[in-house]
Amino acid sequence: MINLVIDFNNIAMRAMYACIYMRESGVTNYDTPEECGILARKITTDIAFILHMFGPDRVIFVCDSKHPWREQLYESIPGMEYKGNRVKDEEKNWNNIFNTMNDLKDIYDKKGFITCEIEHAEADDLAALYKDALYNKRGENVVLVSSDRDWCQLIDFNTDKSNFCLVYNPIANNKGKKKIYLTEQCSEWLNAPEITNIFFNNYSKEKETIRTVSKDPKNEIEVLLPEQILTDKIVCGDDGDNVPGFYEFYQNGKKVRFTELRMKKLFEAAGITDLNGFKEKCIAGSINDYIAKLFKREINDMDSNERLMRQRRLVELNPVLFPVEETNTFASKYEPEMETTKGRITGVTSIKMEDILKDTDYVTEGYERKPRENAIFKNFDTKLLDKFVSNPLF
């Protein structure tokens, strides 16, 4: 069984900019219902493409909520704001954009998909909670869909049960490749020959699906070490989210902080081989001495154990670190859905944008695509236009 967990806001923002960059679409700032309609159809077309690619058994959309709980952690970090380095383009009609996104979430939910949103939670948190509920507790396969590299710390593989959790990045890199991130053990399992008897008892449909997706010339597998990704973020921080490093200071008006090279030197000097070793030094308080030697300055104002916990809560996608209100809401409202047919689309071979948005303001009876929309949908048309069939789910 494959569960597809989609970063809705990530997909929506990508589609929003794509519509503007394609000049033929005529989209400018989303001031009109027509432009918002184009956005809704673009988002849904992108999602339909991903569903067609993986043929999942269950589809889940995880959504960001306002005022994420991590903002509060910055009250003790002078001069910094969570994701404060992101500048909003004031020319765009954000009210219309977010209203369109909210409308789509309601439509997807009514069409039978799962749309998960919890107050003060980010999609990252929800992805981690679904991984725990589906992969860890139920032994099911999970494909996380997002271009957010933070999600890569969630990739996993169970060698005993041969179930996986991997990440698919739907945004192509500068070589035109879309990445499939997985662990080394998962890669070895995928490449191992299938040994079956005449009854195909050992045949894995999920394995064959990922193999097929990876063979697409537009996709590319990349093997990652999830612990290394997390270690880098805890020690070095994350400029993309405006996350500070474990230790940093200003010298001659310039910020000095950990880089990967400095982290490597610190670990070598302290005899640290992995993240657990770093945690042990932080809890014992001895890491400060090694950091002081590395940066050639005294450190008297940092509790390394408290700093470790701050960094972990900022970047680590571990439900144990989330607010209890968030995990309780998930456990009571969303986890029970795993026992129902909610979000299940088993047996559906393909889904068309027109199917999902049928009988809404975005696809009314007699809908025909307008010429101005052809440019933003053309990449999908060549592969999907003749392959979609009527979907019995809708």
Regions of interest found by a model, annotated:
Residues 7, 148, 275-279:
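A short amphipathic alpha-helix within small helical-bundle interaction modules
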Residues 2-145, 151-184, 316, 322-334, ...:
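Noncatalytic, basic helical substrate-engagement surface that gates or grips nucleic-acid strands
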Residues 49-63, 78-92, 113-114, 132, ...:
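Non-catalytic nucleic-acid-binding/docking modules located in mid-to-C-terminal regions
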